[in-house]
Amino acid sequence: MIQSGGAKYGSLLDAKASNDENNPALWGQVHNGRKGPNPWFPFRDSRILLAQLPSHVSAKDTEGRDDPAGRQVLLGAQAVIAALRGTFHLDPVPHLMRSYVPARDVGLRRTGENLSASISVLADREPNKFRRLNELVRLVADHPVRSLAVAQSNLRDVMLIIQEGNAPDEVTPARELSDGLLRFLAIAVALLTADRGLDVDAGSPLDAQVKARVLLVIEELENGLHPSMAARLLSLIRETTSETGAQVVLTTHSHALLNALSGDGAHSIVVCYRDEATQRSHLARLIELAGYAQAMAQGRIGDLVSEGRLVRHEESSADPGAVLHLLGIE
């Protein structure tokens, strides 16, 4: 949405295919907030259109003065690009985390393969977050853990190790850690460093003006994790999202994980279901499903889902009568 003064205009950019069969370009109409018809520009069809806008629109007019309309267009485009660029799909692959990695490779990658380097820089630069990571590991590990540490090779490559007991030689290197613990560590590090410790593309000087944030996506959070680990991560998500400003989207089929959500947590659950009539998938908020209030009075979310309840949108998206009945005011 473009705004110029008190007036608001439609979408930022409308595109259509070229009528020239010999020209594969797209034509885009830029809604710039100025008086008169909106200009049309040619765009390459092999690149995102919004990223090409700076070639056609400027924040300065022909005399070098600030152009508020042009700046609005560029800021709108940058807001969308920053949101796309900031989407970080974390898919930890434990067997890739068991080798030495260059110490300078610190931005956590989507596979978690450079976890050791990320933890190394966390220990050096953010001791408070490193301390929290240690506390989490002690809570979920099935053996006594003194501290996380990093071993360094002669080539200055690093590998994560866990120090156990009091003897200096009681250590377990990353190559011997369980898949579940490595996956847990990768997710925890991503959450703790979501504001500046992930391997996302470099931003633009305009990002600060559009308040760009990271969107961390984790599919099947419970995979390879003991239910207690998953519950700890849920608590960490609640804490870190307010600290880092990041948004987190999780997918899950775990009843135990759903049971760990309580209070306001239910308001953030979205159910994905397939409409049998149309064979299309739909999304609906859990609290908007018919019968939600009555169902929640009879059990926990995960238990209800395992019984086949609260898994699809039936008829009505509101159930005020059930709420009044539960409150005893009919």
PLM features per residue range, with description:
Residues R65, A174, Q209, V323-L324:
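Phosphate/dinucleotide-binding and metal-coordinating scaffold of catalytic cores
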Residues N114, R131, R138-D142, R146-S228:
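Conserved ABC ATPase signature
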